[in-house]
C-alpha cells in the first residue's frame, strides 16, 4: 500500500497504510464482541443439550464438550471465515455485521483488510476443508460413526498447522500488522483468539492418537490370540 501525506485516516497498522475505500464501523467494538460471544454461547448450549438427546449412545462430559467445539468450529469456519473468503475485497467499505466484525478484528491483524496472499489462501483452505469436516465430525460423534476419531485427528492437525503458519508468518514480518502489546488488539484479538486453535486442537489431536493406539493394540491382541489357538 502507498503512504499518505496527511497521516493515516484509519486505525490499522502499519500506520502508513493507504486504505482509500475504508469506511469506519458504525457498530461499537463491545457490541460486535458481545453479539459474537452470545452466538457462541447459544451454539454451545444448544449442542450440549443436543448431544445428550441425539446421540445413539450416551456421551461423557469430555466427548460432549468436543462435540460443542466442533460445532463452534463449523460455524466459525463456514460462516465467519466463509464471509471473509467471499467478500474480502469489499469488507473494507462494507457495513454488514460480519464485515464490521472483520474490520474490528483487523485492528489486531491488518492482513485481513490488505488482501494478504497467505491469509486469503489459508482462510480459503479452512473454509473448504475444515468447515465441512467439522460439521461431519459433529454428526459422526452423535451417530458413533467409525470415522469420528479420524475426522478429529485430521481436523485438529490441519488447524494446528494453519495456526502455526499464521503466527510464524506474522513473526517473520516483525508483528507489523498490529500494535504490538496492545491489551485488546494484540493480546485478545491476535493472540488469545488464535491460540485457542492451538491448545484445544492439540488436546484433541493427542486424544485421537490415544484412541488409535488403543484400537490398534486391541486388534493386535485379538490377532495374536487367534494365532495362538
From Swiss-Prot:
Highly expressed in liver, bowel, adrenal gland, testis, ovary, and uterus and less expressed in brain, cerebellum, skeletal muscle, and heart. Pathway: Steroid biosynthesis; cholesterol biosynthesis. It comes from Cavia porcellus (Guinea pig). The chain crosses the membrane at residues 30-50, 67-87, 119-139, 186-206. The gene is EBP. Its EC number is 5.3.3.5, 3.3.2.11. Keywords: Cholesterol biosynthesis, Cholesterol metabolism, Cytoplasmic vesicle, Endoplasmic reticulum, Hydrolase, Isomerase, Lipid biosynthesis, Lipid metabolism, Membrane, Nucleus, Steroid biosynthesis, Steroid metabolism, Sterol biosynthesis, Sterol metabolism, Transmembrane, Transmembrane helix. InterPro entries: EBP, EXPERA. Isomerase that catalyzes the conversion of Delta(8)-sterols to their corresponding Delta(7)-isomers. One of its GO terms (molecular function) is cholesterol-5,6-oxide hydrolase activity. Binds to the phenylalkylamine calcium-ion antagonist emopamil, an anti-ischemic drug. Belongs to the EBP family. The lineage of its organism: Eukaryota, Metazoa, Chordata, Craniata, Vertebrata. It catalyses: lathosterol = 5alpha-cholest-8-en-3beta-ol; zymosterol = 5alpha-cholesta-7,24-dien-3beta-ol; 5,6alpha-epoxy-5alpha-cholestan-3beta-ol + H2O = 5alpha-cholestane-3beta,5,6beta-triol; 5,6beta-epoxy-5beta-cholestan-3beta-ol + H2O = 5alpha-cholestane-3beta,5,6beta-triol. One of its GO terms (cellular component) is cytoplasmic vesicle. It is a multi-pass membrane protein. GO terms for biological process: cholesterol biosynthetic process; hemopoiesis; ossification involved in bone maturation. It is found in: Endoplasmic reticulum membrane; Nucleus envelope; Cytoplasmic vesicle. Residues 62-205 form the EXPERA domain. This is 3-beta-hydroxysteroid-Delta(8),Delta(7)-isomerase.
Amino acid at each position: 500500500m502507498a503512504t499518505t501525506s496527511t497521516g493515516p485516516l484509519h486505525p490499522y497498522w502499519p500506520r502508513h497504510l493507504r486504505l482509500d475505500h475504508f469506511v469506519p464501523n458504525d457498530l461499537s467494538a463491545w457490541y460486535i464482541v458481545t453479539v459474537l460471544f452470545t452466538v457462541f454461547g447459544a451454539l454451545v448450549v444448544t449442542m450440549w443439550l443436543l448431544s445428550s438427546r441425539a446421540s445413539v449412545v450416551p456421551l461423557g462430559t469430555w466427548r460432549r464438550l468436543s462435540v460443542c467445539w466442533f460445532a463452534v468450529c463449523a460455524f466459525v469456519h463456514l460462516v465467519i471465515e466463509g464471509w471473509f473468503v467471499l467478500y474480502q475485497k469489499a469488507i473494507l467499505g462494507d457495513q454488514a455485521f460480519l464485515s464490521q466484525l472483520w474490520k474490528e478484528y483487523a485492528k489486531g491483524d491488518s492482513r485481513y483488510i490488505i488482501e494478504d496472499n497467505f491469509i486469503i489462501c489459508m482462510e480459503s483452505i479452512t473454509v473448504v476443508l475444515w468447515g465441512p469436516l467439522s460439521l461431519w465430525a459433529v454428526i459422526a460423534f452423535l451417530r458413533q460413526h467409525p470415522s469420528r476419531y479420524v475426522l478429529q485427528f485430521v481436523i485438529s492437525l490441519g488447524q494446528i498447522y494453519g495456526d502455526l503458519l499464521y503466527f510464524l508468518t506474522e513473526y517473520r514480518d516483525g508483528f507489523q500488522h498490529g500494535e504490538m502489546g496492545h491489551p485488546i488488539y494484540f493480546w485478545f484479538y491476535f493472540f488469545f483468539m488464535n491460540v485457542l486453535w492451538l491448545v484445544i486442537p492439540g488436546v484433541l489431536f493427542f486424544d485421537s492418537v490415544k484412541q488409535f493406539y488403543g484400537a490398534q493394540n486391541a486388534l493386535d491382541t485379538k490377532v495374536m490370540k487367534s494365532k495362538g489357538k
